[in-house]
C-alpha cells in the first residue's frame, strides 16, 4: 500500500471546456498525479456497451484539454510518443498533440508479451521494438495500469536504451485508466531513474475518472467472479466527484465486473468483450441467491455501511472539496443504498443481459 495514502486529498486544479481536473495533494509524492473527468470518459466507464472506435473517441476531449494545460505549464516541450502495443492505440496522444499545437518529434513502438511455462506466467518479453531517442524530451505514454508489470518492463527497456545512446529524458507524461498500484510503481521508478539521471523531473500521471483499485491476489470479490490484479473497482481508490455522481444516478453501473474491462478487446475484439461481460452477468444470475447483497454494496462503494459524513469524506479523500458538493454526494449515496433495498441481484443481472445483448446484437456472432 502507498505510504501516507490516507493523508492524500484531491484538490480542484481547473474546470474548462467540460473537463474537471483534480490534483493529488498531501502524499509527499516525487511525481505529479491528476484525475480528469469529462462526459465522454464517464460514459465509457459506466457503459461497457461503448465499443470499437468510440472507445478511442471517448478520450479525445479530456486528453486534449490536459495536453493544453501541460503545455501551458511548460511540462511538455519537445514530445516523443511511446506506443506500447496494443493498449496504447486507445489513447489519442498524437491527435491531442496536433490539436494543441505540440510538436511530436517521433513515435516509438513496443510490444511486451507474457511468457508462460507449464501454464504459469514466468515473466515478460519484449517482442517488437522500434525506438527513437529525442534527447531531453518528454516521453508521452498511454496505457492501462493494473499490476503495472508491462509498463515497468517497457520503461526500463526504454531508459536503458536512452542511456546506451548517451542521452536522457526530461520527464515522462502518462495518460492512464488505472489503479493505485500505478502510483506505487511510479514513485519507485522515479527514485531508480534519479540515481543515474539526477535532473529527471519525474512522471506527470493523468488518470481518467479516478485512481481505482484492483482486487488483490486470491480475492475474487463478494460475487466470487472477479479477477485479481485485473478488475478495477472503487475500494481504496479516489474517484472523480462527477464520475461518482453519474454512476450513482443509475442503478446498474456500480455492479459491473470492472470499471473498464479489457480496453483492447473493447476496441478490436468486440466479440471477446461481449463474451466477458455476458459471462459475468450470467454468473451473477446463477449465484444471485448466494451473494450477500449488503456485502457487495459495501465492496463496490468501498466502505462499510452505514457510514457517517465525516468518515465518508475521509474515505473518499474529499475533505478539501466544496462542502455543498460533498454533502450532496453523500446524500446521493445514502439514497442509492436505500433505493437498492427492494432491487434483487437477479433483476439487475437480467436487465444487464437484456440491455447488453440488445445494444450490441450486431456484434454477437
Regions found by a protein language model. Give the residues of each.
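PRPP-associated nucleotide enzymes
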Residues: 1-365
Amino acid at each position: 500500500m502507498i505510504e501516507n495514502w490516507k493523508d492524500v486529498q484531491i484538490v480542484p486544479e481547473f474546470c474548462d471546456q467540460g473537463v474537471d481536473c483534480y490534483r493529488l495533494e498531501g502524499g509527499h509524492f516525487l511525481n505529479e498525479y491528476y484525475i480528469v473527468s469529462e462526459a465522454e470518459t464517464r460514459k465509457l466507464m459506466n457503459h461497457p456497451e461503448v465499443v470499437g472506435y468510440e472507445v478511442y473517441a471517448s478520450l479525445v476531449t479530456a486528453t486534449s484539454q490536459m495536453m493544453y494545460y501541460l503545455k501551458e505549464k511548460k511540462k511538455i516541450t519537445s514530445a516523443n510518443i511511446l506506443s506500447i502495443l496494443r493498449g496504447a492505440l486507445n489513447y489519442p496522444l498524437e491527435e491531442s498533440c496536433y490539436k494543441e499545437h505540440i510538436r511530436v518529434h517521433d513515435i516509438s513502438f513496443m510490444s511486451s508479451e507474457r511468457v508462460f511455462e507449464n501454464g504459469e506466467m514466468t515473466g515478460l518479453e519484449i517482442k517488437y521494438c522500434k525506438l527513437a531517442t529525442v534527447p531531453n524530451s518528454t516521453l508521452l505514454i498511454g496505457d492501462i495500469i493494473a499490476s503495472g508489470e508491462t509498463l515497468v518492463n517497457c520503461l526500463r527497456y526504454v531508459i536503458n536504451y536512452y542511456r546506451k545512446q548517451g542521452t536522457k529524458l526530461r520527464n515522462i507524461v502518462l495518460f492512464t485508466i488505472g489503479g493505485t498500484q500505478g502510483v506505487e510503481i511510479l514513485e519507485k521508478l522515479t527514485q531508480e531513474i534519479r540515481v543515474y539521471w539526477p535532473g529527471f523531473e519525474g512522471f506527470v500521471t493523468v488518470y481518467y475518472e479516478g485512481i481505482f483499485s484492483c482486487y488483490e491476489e486470491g480475492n475474487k470479490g463478494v460475487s466470487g467472479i472477479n479477477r485479481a490484479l485485473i478488475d478495477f473497482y472503487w475500494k481504496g481508490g479516489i474517484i472523480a466527484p462527477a464520475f461518482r455522481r453519474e454512476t450513482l444516478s443509475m442503478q446498474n453501473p456500480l455492479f459491473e465486473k470492472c470499471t473498464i474491462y479489457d480496453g483492447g478487446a473493447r476496441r478490436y475484439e468486440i466479440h471477446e468483450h461481449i463474451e466477458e461481460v455476458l459471462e459475468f452477468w450470467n454468473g451473477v444470475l446463477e449465484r444471485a441467491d448466494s451473494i450477500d447483497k449488503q456485502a457487495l454494496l459495501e465492496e463496490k462503494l468501498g466502505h462499510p455501511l452505514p457510514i457517517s459524513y465525516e468518515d465518508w469524506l475521509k474515505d473518499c479523500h474529499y475533505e478539501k472539496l466544496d462542502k455543498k458538493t460533498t454533502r450532496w454526494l453523500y446524500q446521493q449515496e445514502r439514497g442509492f443504498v436505500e433505493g437498492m433495498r427492494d432491487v434483487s441481484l437477479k433483476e439487475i443481472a437480467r436487465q444487464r443481459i437484456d440491455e447488453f445483448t440488445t445494444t450490441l446484437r450486431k456484434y454477437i456472432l
